Amino acid sequence: MKERILVTGGTGYIGSHTVVELQNSGYEVIIVDNLSNSSADVVDNIEKVSGIRPAFEKLDCLDLDGLDAVFAKYKGIKGIIHFAASKAVGESVQKPLLYYRNNLVSLINLLELMPKHGVEGIIFSSSCTVYGQPDELPVTEKAPIKKAESPYGNTKQINEEIIRDTVASGSPINAILLRYFNPIGAHPSALLGELPNGVPQNLIPYLTQTAIGIREQLSVFGDDYNTPDGSCIRDFINVVDLAKAHVIAIDRILNKKQKESVEVFNIGTGRGLSVLELINAFEKVIKVEQRIPVRIEFAENNKPEDMKRLRAGMNVECIVNY
């Protein structure tokens, strides 16, 4: 019998790619998603890509009783990969209570139900934002956790502490915290990608929409960074590679390969790429007839959500080669 994995936020950008990789690896997947930033059509596309249709339950993870019913319906769930969360940095500044409610309570509900239903482990979708403004580059897992730069980043920090405190209290739960950098790209089939409801929050959707004329120009925030071209440098990681990292992590928990009950891994490439370099690479790959119009904008307070240079000093090879 295939081992069952619950994926919250499984119709989202990273979640949908992870569901495909889980199914390709022989897992049976149950998706829980409220579709607040995605579409049920994604389930159809997952089936087209993998040849397997995952179980899907439209449900908000704030609904404790609803989650309890899902665990009861799909008995024997062995692990959880928890993506479901509100994730827009700017919006979190405007709506902090929404973010604290959505991002904290959803995790608490899962942790409360895991022992009851015999779930062995959880992979938590964390973020490089937990490092705040790092002192050294590249950023390793040993880097100190600094003051969060937004309510969104703070929810990631708090959730990590919630997991640690829960495990320390004697809970039988095992956990891996994946702190990843900047997911980018799409599935090679082009059936899955970053298709948010409403206004995009990341660079690539804006870039593609500008290239096909949906948007008149692409806004780049800042040209005065201490970088070769003046634009922000990020560590971009392909979303399929990121999805595979989640499969490796769940394998690690279920095969009891962990060295500690709570482990942390940075997931990135360890190489920096500037925003303008990425735009130029995009133009070359798709062979645009004319350059994508770019407007440089500046935000107040030096854009605290943008860390000028952030690269991962990854420990991921430790779990790839376990």
Task: Show which residues each predicted segment covers.
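Residue-level signal for the nucleotide or nucleotide-sugar donor/cofactor binding architecture
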Residues: 62, 94, 102, 150, ...
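Catalytic helix-loop patch of NAD(P)-dependent Rossmann-fold dehydrogenases
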Residues: 94-97, 101, 105-112, 116, ...
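N-terminal Rossmann/SDR dinucleotide-binding element
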Residues: 2-79, 199
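Conserved NAD(P)H cofactor-binding loop of Rossmann-fold oxidoreductase domains
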Residues: 84-87, 126-127
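Hydrophobic alpha-helical membrane-insertion signals
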Residues: 280-322
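N-terminal Rossmann-like NAD(P) cofactor-binding module of classical short-chain dehydrogenase/reductase
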Residues: 78-81, 123
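C-terminal substrate-binding subdomain of Rossmann-fold SDR/epimerase-dehydratase oxidoreductases
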Residues: 209-284
